Design a protein with these regions (language model features):
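ATP-binding/phosphotransfer module of carbohydrate and carboxylate kinases, centering on a glycine-rich
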Residues: 1-69, 81-83, 101-108, 126-129, ...
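Short beta-strand segments
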Residues: 6, 72-76, 114, 133-140, ...
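Hydrophobic "anchor" residues
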Residues: 22-23, 86, 151-152
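Residue-level detector of high-confidence beta-strand sites
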Residues: 26-28, 89, 122, 154
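Short, active-site-adjacent cap segments at secondary-structure transitions
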Residues: 77-81, 119-121, 142-143, 152, ...
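A charged helix-plus-loop insertion that forms the helical arch/lid used to bind
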Residues: 84-95
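Conserved phosphate-binding catalytic cores of ATP/NTP-utilizing and phosphoryl-transfer enzymes
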Residues: 111-135
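Glycine-rich phosphate-binding loop of actin/hexokinase-like ATP-binding domains
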Residues: 130-191
Length: 307
């Protein structure tokens, strides 16, 4: 039995998932925005949710947690530091906190944490024998690698994290020297993200508009908004080209508000031949429009890998 929990700026939720992968129960919640309050909230949610199941598991106070129960946590835009602490662009109060250590102390449960891309890749994989790359495009950009059904973390816990790698094959107007939040220039997240969409639109129109509205206008045929999205799609193709050349994944999963399920699967393969070694790429592309449930499933898979 696994408890899966997701912290997101869109939908946060918790679920009890059986060993067979079935959702025993699930609920959404509004996360606290204070670190200690959040830890207590998570402990309380676990106690309440497990006590109300018919499985006989009673997490109760931390000391009474069942040894067969474990906690997997998915946090949007999560990053890891070498000292075991984390950061999150969505939840800045988590910055520099030893989240996994404190979770285990607060809940009494063996715990594992991952970001949306990592949990999405684990939760949405179709075959355990495939190599998969997952990409999440939202306020930030994150990536992850899944091989043989398991998350590849890497020596520094950053495998697949292409966020702050340079945009491949840049054209002159993209080399404007704009500085990323990390202090470098030319980072992928600077171009492939919701703030990146807004920046491109403002450069064209000198008008501020939310990424939500730009994406909506593009679907309605607005020429300027559509041109911004076309540039984004070309950048996604370029960002994935080195991934294909190096990893050659069987499957690429993309999620996020800017990931159009009707456009990207057709557009990306047409752009890749100019950037990759394979002359006729057969990489499978899947767009996940709602990643909440896959991320919960992935959080459960993440902790099972640890245990």
């Amino acid at each position: 039995m696994t408890i899966a929990l997701r912290l997101s700026d869109t939908v946060s939720g918790i679920a009890v998932i059986s060993d067979d992968g079935d959702f025993v129960c699930e609920q959404t919640f509004l996360p606290e925005i204070d670190y200690q309050l959040l830890l207590r909230q998570i402990s309380s949610l676990i106690s309440g949710l497990t006590a109300n199941t018919t499985t006989g598991i009673n997490a109760g106070p931390p000391a009474n947690a069942s040894p067969s129960t474990a906690l997997g946590l998915c946090v949007s835009d999560l990053r890891y530091a070498s000292n075991g602490s984390v950061t999150s662009a969505v939840f800045p109060f988590l910055d520099d906190k030893p989240l996994m250590r404190d979770l285990q102390a607060a809940t009494g449960l063996t715990s594992a944490i991952g970001n949306d891309a990592q949990c999405l890749g684990l939760g949405a994989r179709q075959h355990d024998n495939e190599t998969l790359f997952s990409l999440v495009i939202d306020k930030d950009l994150s990536g992850a690698i899944i091989m043989n059904g398991k998350l590849v973390k890497g020596r520094n816990n950053h495998a697949g994290q292409i966020t702050h790698t340079p945009l491949p094959f840049p054209v002159p107007f993209e080399l404007d020297g704009s500085v990323c939040s990390c202090g470098r220039t030319g980072c992928l997240t600077h171009f492939i993200s919701l703030p990146g969409i807004e920046k491109d639109y403002k450069q064209l129109t000198n008008t501020d508009k939310s990424a939500d509205n730009i994406i909506a206008d593009a679907t309605k045929g607005d020429i300027i908004a559509d041109s911004v999205i076309q540039v984004l799609e070309d950048r996604i193709a370029r960002a994935l080209a080195p991934v294909i050349n190096l990893l050659d994944p069987d499957h690429i999963i993309i999620s996020g508000q800017a990931a159009d399920k009707n456009r990207l699967p057709a557009i990306l393969p047409r752009k890749w031949p100019g950037y990759i070694v394979a002359d006729k790429p057969t990489t499978e592309i899947t767009i996940i429009t709602d990643r909440h449930v896959p991320c919960l499933n992935g959080a459960a898979s993440l902790v099972l890998q640890k245990t």
